[in-house]
Design a protein with these regions (language model features):
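Acidic, serine/proline-rich low-complexity intrinsically disordered regions
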Residues: 4-247
Length: 247
């Protein structure tokens, strides 16, 4: 497992390489209050209001806030149930319509978030908010052996899929932000979420840094509409093998 400083450096590199508008979010599930760093915001205690978890993610990535959300800080039931902070209601299955993973009840007392580049703790999961072009560049940097590990979740609740799912199942997760992300946390319409288990992050950065030397790196993206556009040599060879070089 990487050190805290190494995780911080990963956060800096992700922002720089992908030109991210907001900070990747370091997420740690809490088993005891002693793990809450000094200065972390407790919404109900410190500001006398509650937040949905998507709003806490938004404040962390935009305002660079470290936030600890215990059950008394939450204002949306999905995260409380998914993170195992409350028992599932009797007589109903809240996961029936849009299935999602949940931690065992009582395993965790809360969730801690901070910008990855300044987090004072080792995360369990890192959530990257990006536009679709940034996400494409990130995914294209993956090696062939990693591609089968990329999965997607496209239904609510994204707060569960971005935290519980990668922790329980491993792998990489592309997540469509749910309505709460848009309506309450002010997620841009073009943004996607990408969740990475913390132990996979250093390797992801190795591949992403190597990818910067190739033409598909995000900073090399540009728009153009041109017939007979310049092609790489392997394109030319393929067309020659097909007998299409003279057409």
């Amino acid at each position: 497992m990487a050190t805290i400083k190494e995780f911080n450096r990963c956060g800096e590199e992700l922002e720089k390489i992908l030109l991210l508008r907001t900070s990747p979010v370091a997420v740690k599930m809490l088993t005891k209050k002693a793990d809450i760093p000094a200065g972390a915001l407790r919404p109900k205690k410190d500001r006398k209001y509650h937040l949905a978890q998507c709003q806490a993610f938004a404040m962390t990535r935009r305002e660079r806030a470290t936030i600890a959300m215990l059950k008394e800080d939450h204002w949306c039931p999905a995260a409380l149930m998914a993170y195992g902070m409350v028992p599932l209601p009797e007589g109903m299955n809240p996961t029936r319509m849009h299935p999602y993973e949940c931690f065992s009840y009582g395993k965790y007392i809360g969730i801690l978030t901070a910008p990855l580049k300044t987090a004072a703790f080792k995360p369990d999961v890192v959530i990257i908010y990006s536009n679709t072009s940034q996400l494409r560049s990130l995914l294209l940097s993956f090696g062939h052996d990693e591609i089968p590990q990329v999965n997607g979740r496209f239904f609510p609740p994204s707060c569960a899929h971005a935290v519980v799912t990668p922790m329980l199942k491993g792998g990489y997760w592309v997540i469509l932000p749910d309505p709460g992300e848009y309506q309450r946390a002010l997620c841009d319409e073009g943004e996607m979420m990408f969740a990475v288990p913390a132990e996979k992050l250093p390797g992801l950065l190795v591949g992403l840094n190597k990818f910067q030397e190739q033409g598909f790196a995000y900073r090399n993206n540009y728009y153009f509409m041109q017939g007979d556009f310049p092609r790489p040599d392997f394109y030319k060879k393929m067309f020659k093998d097909w007998g299409l070089e003279d057409y």
